[in-house]
């Protein structure tokens, strides 16, 4: 394979979702084994909100929530912080390689309000459940934490309501039609594409250099950034978005991304299991109403906003301004949750047990239960897809006739 063939196939073209999500599952497994924590983003975004408040004299470090997730240090001294910086760098490099960076403004104030309000709801729900589509779902289920299953089911339900809500007439933005005499071919400016590809390489190797230099003195921080770059490349090149996985399933019947996510978790689970058997402690959270309520809010919020915690990150660096507002909403929502946490934490979370399936059913029993539940989820998704298109077929035939 020549350089030009490799460049076009792997650095410019989008990647297939299933292999990319499987790769993300494997990468997240090694990330857990090496750093001792799971791939997660909203916890760090919440810390950013807390530290912004500290700049204005607010003693956020005294809030109960920040005593749980820890507010010490800065993004440059925290594993999650360095990983997220790596993610942004990886996303930006991948977008530049493909010449997929362009400033795109929201076309309506309604879209901006959707982004902010949906982002706030999603951020609040994610932190109520102690995780978003990563820590309470994609990387939470392979940790064998029961709360992640509560969150996943509730998120699916919340996304159904979100999909129905966003189909209301108020969200239908008028499309401006422009008369043309012929179709315009899709073209790129070769010089611009070359410049951006080189800039992408500069960003990529710059991030690698930063990570390796950091790893010389602080190995975990440097490796966290390297993992972040890998995660960023995967989510941008494969356009991995959990919002589309849920929303598309309800609206269009497409389940390709949802299936990919299930398979990715199945691959990750056995790796996490092996690390746990070697003595690494899994991340188990409270299996209480917080997981259910948080999941409902999160599912509704991500569909209203149009993007989840990973989806908005790569779209933001591609220049889609709508997702800058989603990200801002996430930080605001998660910070609001941190402020009110002490008021309802006992009733919704901390008075409930942290249930580890590997302890409840034994190591092999917990592993088996997890795979049975993943298989059941996959069968339900396939069943929904068949039902959706079976119901849609007569309507399509009627429209054609």
Swiss-Prot record:
InterPro entries: Sulf_transp_TsuA/YedE, YedE-like. It comes from the Bacteria. One of its GO terms (cellular component) is plasma membrane. It is a multi-pass membrane protein. Keywords: Cell inner membrane, Cell membrane, Membrane, Transmembrane, Transmembrane helix, Transport. Residues 35-78, 139-147, 220-221, 281-283, 342-363 are periplasmic. The keyword Transmembrane helix applies. The chain crosses the membrane at residues 14-34, 79-99, 116-138, 148-170, 199-219, 222-242, 260-280, 284-304, 321-341, 364-384. It is found in: Cell inner membrane. NCBIfam families: selen_YedE_FdhT. Belongs to the TsuA/YedE (TC 9.B.102) family. This is Probable transporter YedE.
């Amino acid at each position: 394979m020549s350089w030009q063939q490799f460049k076009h196939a792997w650095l410019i073209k989008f990647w297939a979702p299933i292999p990319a999500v499987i790769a993300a599952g494997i990468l997240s497994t090694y990330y857990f084994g090496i750093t001792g924590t799971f791939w997660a983003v909203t916890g760090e975004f919440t810390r950013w909100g807390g530290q912004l408040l500290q700049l204005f004299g607010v003693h956020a470090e005294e809030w109960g929530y920040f005593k749980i997730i820890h507010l010490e240090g800065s993004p440059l001294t925290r594993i999650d912080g360095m990983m997220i910086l790596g993610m942004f760098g990886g996303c930006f490099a991948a977008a530049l390689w493909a010449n997929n960076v362009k400033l795109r403004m929201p076309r309506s104030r309604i879209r901006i309000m959707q982004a902010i309000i949906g982002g706030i709801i999603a951020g609040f729900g994610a932190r109520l459940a102690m995780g978003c589509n990563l820590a309470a779902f994609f990387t939470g289920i392979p940790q064998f934490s029961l709360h992640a299953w509560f969150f996943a089911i509730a998120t699916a339900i919340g996304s159904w309501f979100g999909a129905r809500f966003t189909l209301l007439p108020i969200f239908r933005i008028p499309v401006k039609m422009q008369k043309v005499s012929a179709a315009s071919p899709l073209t790129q400016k070769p010089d611009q594409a070359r410049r951006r590809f080189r800039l992408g390489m500069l960003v990529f190797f710059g991030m690698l250099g930063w990570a390796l230099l950091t790893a010389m003195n602080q190995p975990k921080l440097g490796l966290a950034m390297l993992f972040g770059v890998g995660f960023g490349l995967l989510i941008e090149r494969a356009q991995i978005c959990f919002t589309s996985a849920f929303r598309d399933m309800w609206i269009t019947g497409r389940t390709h991304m949802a299936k990919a996510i299930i398979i990715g978790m199945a691959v990750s689970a056995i790796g996490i299991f092996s690390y746990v058997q070697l003595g690494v402690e899994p991340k188990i959270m409270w299996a209480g109403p917080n997981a259910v309520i948080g999941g409902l809010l999160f599912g509704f919020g991500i569909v209203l906003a149009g993007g989840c915690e990973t989806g908005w990150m790569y779209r933001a660096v591609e220049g889609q301004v709508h997702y800058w507002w989603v990200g801002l909403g996430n930080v605001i929502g998660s910070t609001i949750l941190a402020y009110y946490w002490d008021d309802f934490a006992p009733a919704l979370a901390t008075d409930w047990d942290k249930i580890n399936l590997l302890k409840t059913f034994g190591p092999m029993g917990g592993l088996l239960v997890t795979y049975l539940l993943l298989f059941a989820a996959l069968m339900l998704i396939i069943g929904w897809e068949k039902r959706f298109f079976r119901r849609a077929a007569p309507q399509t035939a009627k429209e054609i006739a």
